Amino acid sequence: MTILGMNRRNALIAKLNPREAIKGVNQKFETKERLAAAGVPVPPTLALIADEADAATFDYASLPQAFAIKPNRGRRGEGVILVDGRVEGGWRKLNGEVLTERMLRAHVTRILAGELSLEGGNSDAALIEPLIRTHPDFARMVPFGLPDIRIICLGDVPLMAMTRLPTEESGGRANLHQGAVGAAIDFRDGRIFRAVLGQEAVWDHPAPATALI
């Protein structure tokens, strides 16, 4: 079995892709615009809060019951908040915690300051989108949150694929660094043949205990 480590992967990305293309995909909003222009479905943008002036005038009460807020140039799922409904005093996060408007404003301030951005320290923007629901085919595998599928291609040729499955620990986020399960997919039949949680191999999703392999 050939293993592609993170360092080698990053080296190949830098070697095989134009610098401007890499810079573009590190920005969620710009990536969405490019995908939409190419006819790829993307979630609508509720708001892009670009600076403190935007934050001061933004009407947080206008937000829907369920939404996601994330740094435009975020990394490893840091700074992503998933909101699943309104409650007295604010909103309910996907993990059950209450999020007040004051807390949300403070979070946006941290995003704008670049505390949660890929570069770290450079100014960023806060992207707000509707909360996307799990596809029924994934529903049996995850208790909540939004799984996704990642495919690594060389040109137009797919080389490997994985699905990222949120857990209670990850707060519904499909980010491995936040505690999601990473599961390798066999191209021949679409089945999962290996899964990891953190540094450990697993055979089941932790909650509920659903067999993956």
State the predicted function of each range.
Residues M1:
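Conserved binding/catalytic microenvironments
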Residues G96-E200:
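Phosphate-binding site of ATP-dependent enzymes
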Residues R8-V80, G85-K93, E101-S117:
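A conserved helix-loop-beta module that forms one wall/lid of the active-site cleft
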Residues G5-E20, E200-L212:
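A short, surface-exposed helix-loop junction/capping segment
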Residues K23-G24, A47, G79-L82, L131, ...:
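Residue-level preference for alpha-helix termini and adjacent loops
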Residues A50, A174-A184, P206-I213:
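A short, hydrophobic/aromatic-rich structural module that often spans a beta strand
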